[in-house]
């Protein structure tokens, strides 16, 4: 029996080998206890404020919406220590690991942002850290790999499968099944077996809470819609959670359409996948006709994931949130537009959400509306990728 509901509608659950059930039970018990412990909460809030730099700014775009009646705000998770929203929940999970008496952290990473966040939290709190990363992602995210190693983490390349995030997740789970007595698996997104989707949401929900308070202070009302990119979905559920009951606010999640949905080279399982069991949960996922997990694709390493968190699947199924997709090229255009118009270089992941916001504005330029894009991370890690693409196109 679980203490918390392991499902969101039909999605979620705990589809793991029996050997991991005691570890998940211990984790759930520690989380429930910590949520009720004022000392734990005070330490978490102190780290968020005085180490990570919360609250993050809500920035009104000055130039990007010129000639339209839209006010476009950016929730600046890119300003957080570590460079992305990932820092929020790893601090919470690292404190939970200490609470459970663990001495080691196992993590997986795609873009490297969760790896960097895990490494900094472990350095701060005195935990050993080993991070699994697809060999392909190590190539395209070398600055983040060096950051992790600089902070004392062991980065382990994964060469199996497509050598990306999916394979890193599998290796991390395999490691944990043999080491859970001393190690905590610090999952990087709001997916996987229960209680991870709930834990990650609760340790990210300050994004939406702050946004709501900042909007009321700045505009005296809530936004018409909030937008966030969706890979596994942690930054999006962090933004959405506090707005779910505010039905006047649209929730828009943006998946990667990659080279185009019709090519099959994408990472949009919510709208174009089938429900199955993967990574310890029941959720939509990209599958072959034989039912095997299909390789996902995105220009953005952090969105290159063949499934999605169960709460997003549920919000989609009941129509509370809308999920759309943006291609590599559209994300690149948004990346360039924000850099040139506002002097803010966004992560390629966040550029997907920004691209859809810009598409909405172009379609109804005279509509008076307030949109908030969760700028989940900064683009420093992506400048070499973008440079090579623009150079190949003759744009630079």
From Swiss-Prot:
Cofactor: pyridoxal 5'-phosphate
Pfam family, one: PALP
SUPFAM superfamilies given in the database record: Tryptophan synthase beta subunit-like PLP-dependent enzymes
Gene Ontology MF term list: tryptophan synthase activity
Coiled-coil annotated spans: none
UniProt keyword annotations, A-Z: Amino-acid biosynthesis, Aromatic amino acid biosynthesis, Lyase, Pyridoxal phosphate, Tryptophan biosynthesis
Leader sequence segment: none
EC numbers for this chain: 4.2.1.20
Residues where N6-(pyridoxal phosphate)lysine is found: 86
InterPro entries: Trp_synth_b_CS, Trp_synth_beta, Trp_synth_beta/beta-like, TrpB-like_PALP, TrpB-like_PALP_sf
GO CC field: cytoplasm
Catalysed reactions, as listed in the record: (1S,2R)-1-C-(indol-3-yl)glycerol 3-phosphate + L-serine = D-glyceraldehyde 3-phosphate + L-tryptophan + H2O
Pathway: Amino-acid biosynthesis; L-tryptophan biosynthesis; L-tryptophan from chorismate: step 5/5
Complex and partners: Tetramer of two alpha and two beta chains.
Function, in words: The beta subunit is responsible for the synthesis of L-tryptophan from indole and L-serine.
PANTHER family per UniProt: TRYPTOPHAN SYNTHASE, TRYPTOPHAN SYNTHASE-RELATED
Family: Belongs to the TrpB family.
Protein name: Tryptophan synthase beta chain
Organism name: Serratia proteamaculans (strain 568)
